[in-house]
Amino acid sequence: MRIGLLGGSFNPPHQAHRAISLFALKRLQLDRVWWLVTPGNPLKDNGGLHALAERAAAARKVAADPRIEISCLESVIGTRYTADTIDYLRRRASRLRFVWIMGADNLAQFHRWQKWQHIAAQVPIAVVDRPPRSFRALNAPAARALARYRVAEADASRLADRAAPAWVYLTGLKMSLSSTGLRNPDGSWKSF
């Protein structure tokens, strides 16, 4: 089984998360996408972060597709770092083929993630374009360091079968929604 992993705060979850997941299911020929709702992002201020259970419940409503599963795994296993989560999943579910899914905005700062090289060495990565962030993302330190492992977009459907490091930059999905844009100044969620 081929599983896409989409990690995030989901504060709040929104239609772009769903659109990215459906896009990845199709373009990467995945069987499922798991939304890994994090207890807290180590690179962000978590002061306005809603309760994990509230974010997971909202994510289930937004996902609205049986191929998208919502998980609070990081809370269960007691980690907040993607590298540790991926190591755990690879040990516990070695028969599954995982692909890490991220937006171009995350590729632009991927070099700041704990053990980012380890993540890239453990699972293939699919980066979904988020204009106008394309240029910055593709010229970021991690993108430059991993340039020789980039897979042609035409071969994206076979990414899950490739040994890491391997990554693809997917274009064609145009969604400008962001969780930041859906939060009020006090941290409450706007209607969506």
Curated annotation (Swiss-Prot):
Coiled coil: none annotated. Keywords: ATP-binding, NAD, Nucleotide-binding, Nucleotidyltransferase, Pyridine nucleotide biosynthesis, Transferase. Pathway: Cofactor biosynthesis; NAD(+) biosynthesis; deamido-NAD(+) from nicotinate D-ribonucleotide: step 1/1. GO terms for molecular function: ATP binding; nicotinate-nucleotide adenylyltransferase activity. Its EC number is 2.7.7.18. SUPFAM superfamilies: Nucleotidylyl transferase. GO terms for biological process: NAD biosynthetic process. InterPro entries: Cyt_trans-like, NadD/NMNAT, Rossmann-like_a/b/a_fold. It catalyses: nicotinate beta-D-ribonucleotide + ATP + H(+) = deamido-NAD(+) + diphosphate. It comes from the Bacteria. Pfam families: CTP_transf_like. The keyword Nucleotidyltransferase applies. Catalyzes the reversible adenylation of nicotinate mononucleotide (NaMN) to nicotinic acid adenine dinucleotide (NaAD). Belongs to the NadD family. This is Probable nicotinate-nucleotide adenylyltransferase. It comes from Bradyrhizobium sp. (strain ORS 278).
